[in-house]
């Protein structure tokens, strides 16, 4: 079964963007390639219980098991040895990607306290968008009583757009709530 956001993208967003940017071929229209959710563990890397809890939370939020990222080299100042767990990463593609983006836009972001909209300055120059979240409680899948510590996450939305203007138009057409109607 196709996701609601994917169906909306194919039926409404593609024709709109094709007309807006004068694309001759439908394959020129920007699309979302993948979404990467990353969480740095910080002091939780010392404690296996916190690592497992964080991995379980990210798995619940993303709907897919995450990969534990490990340090490449030892850094004495941070008390990190080589191959020590330092973060968790989940890469979403296909149906799960659209399901997560739909939940992010329609459920999680509106639950942020004093939410004013997303910044347009987080584009990387190639149409990809990154955002950071301070806490995991905005996702309805997370039980407030089950969490041990507030931890944020970084979310990167990688698109096939070649410039920020196209990436902004794609995300705005999909319903991403931005502060301003134009890109800076």
Curated annotation (Swiss-Prot):
Keywords: Chloroplast, Plastid, Ribonucleoprotein, Ribosomal protein, RNA-binding, rRNA-binding. The keyword Thylakoid does not apply. Coiled coil: none annotated. One of its GO terms (cellular component) is chloroplast. One of its GO terms (biological process) is translation. GO terms for molecular function: rRNA binding; structural constituent of ribosome. It is found in: Plastid, Chloroplast. Gene3D superfamilies: 3.30.1440.10. It holds the Pfam family Ribosomal_L5_C. Belongs to the universal ribosomal protein uL5 family. Part of the 50S ribosomal subunit; contacts the 5S rRNA. Binds 5S rRNA, forms part of the central protuberance of the 50S subunit. This is Large ribosomal subunit protein uL5c.
